[in-house]
Regions:
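The alpha/beta-hydrolase serine catalytic core
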Residues: 72-186
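C-terminal cap/substrate-recognition subdomain and adjoining C-terminal extension
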Residues: 240-316
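Asp-based phosphoryl-transfer active-site loop
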Residues: 192-212
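Short, acidic loop-to-helix structural element flanking the phosphoryl-transfer center
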Residues: 207-231
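Short, hydrophobic beta-strand segments that form beta-sheet elements in well-ordered domains
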Residues: 53-57, 73-75, 137-143, 262-264, ...
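Gly/Ala-rich beta-loop-alpha elbow adjacent to hydrolase catalytic centers
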Residues: 56-66
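Active-site catalytic motif of lipid deacylating hydrolases and related acyltransferases
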Residues: 1-49
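Non-catalytic pre-domain segments flanking phosphatase-related domains
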Residues: 184-199, 316
Length: 316
């Protein structure tokens, strides 16, 4: 189920995008009434009727989605303080719908009284942040969003708060590389699906100068479709700066898929998984119980060689 943003409709490009990129999914969406109390009531009725596996809300829709308790939800750049956003960005007075609506209405008026109504509705956010809800709610926040800045507020109440590279509006890159990974995590949990685990050394992704190894990000994204990936980095014994550097680099290069998938370990051979990808120059501390793929070796000179290996395992 998709919940659209301010001055939008169920006919938005995001609905088309979700249907195109997730062709097996049944996507439901509806035009939200301009009156916020009517809008919230309509959405609550809709979730009871549709019983969606997942709700995705963007911007103002993220504010509404937060209040649809009991369902798995992804809030993308949620305007959790929509009344403040409206006042700060000229969303008061005569407005034009950005997408066609079923009733054919093209314009609407936002009055000061209506802004107050939105403020009343936004104050209902965070009414239930119980342990059960913690696992239902994910927040994704664009690091270049010029309109909404609610990461601090969201993270005061929920633990799954994640930055992604992007601005306020959804596009193909944001949906593919930031939203779909979270959808995959939620879907795996709902279906109790256990993927094979691949540990990847940070030094297999990052070169000595701090840049990306050739084709590393492309390979990571391709592997992510099939495997549960974890990045392994050395754990500094006397300083936490090294951990912060790794987290910063992964946030910049890998982004959302690195969230909660970083392991700091000086004895990676003790990790329990199916595959370990590491540079061939690494001195082994012992025998990893799974399969070790050594990047830079005669067998796997490049990431492209590694990417030829995995499809063969599945008979492709």
């Amino acid at each position: 189920m998709y919940v659209h943003g301010f001055a939008s409709s169920a006919n938005s490009g995001t609905v088309t995008r979700i249907r195109t990129m997730l062709p097996s999914a049944i996507v439901v969406a509806d035009d939200i009434p301009v009156d916020p109390h009517e809008g919230l009531a309509m959405l609550r009725s809709m979730v009871e009727r549709e019983q969606p596996d997942l709700i995705i809300g963007t911007s103002m829709g993220g504010m509404y989605t937060e209040q649809l308790h009991g369902f798995d939800r992804i809030l993308v750049n949620p305007a959790l303080r929509i009344a403040d956003t409206m006042g700060a960005h000229g969303m008061v007075g005569k407005q034009t719908f950005q997408n066609p609506r079923k009733d054919g209405v093209q314009e609407f008026i936002v009055t000061k009284a209506m802004v107050k109504e939105y403020r009343d509705v936004q104050e209902q956010c965070f009414a239930d942040t119980s342990e059960a809800e913690q696992e239902h709610v994910w927040g994704l926040f664009g690091d270049e969003d010029p309109l909404v800045h609610t990461y601090p507020l969201f993270s005061e109440h929920y633990r799954h708060a994640i930055w992604f590279h992007g601005e306020h509006r959804m596009n193909d890159d944001i949906f593919l590389n930031s939203v779909i990974p979270v959808i995959r995590w939620i879907d795996d949990r709902q279906n109790k699906k256990e993927r094979q685990v691949v540990f990847i050394s940070i030094d297999a992704l990052r070169d000595k100068n701090g840049g990306q190894q050739p084709s590393a990000r492309k390979a990571f994204r391709q592997l992510l479709e099939t495997y549960n990936l974890f990045i392994v980095a050395p754990s500094p014994n006397y300083s936490g700066d090294g951990c912060a550097d790794v987290q910063s680099w992964l946030k910049d290069v890998i982004s959302v898929p690195a969230y909660d998938h970083i392991i700091f370990a000086n004895q990676p051979q003790l990790l329990l998984g199916d595959f370990l990808i590491q540079p061939s120059a690494v001195n082994p501390h012992g025998s990893f119980m799974g399969t070790v793929l050594e990047l830079g070796s005669d067998t796997f000179k490049t990431w492209d060689d590694i990417m030829e290996y995995f499809p063969r395992l599945n008979g492709h």
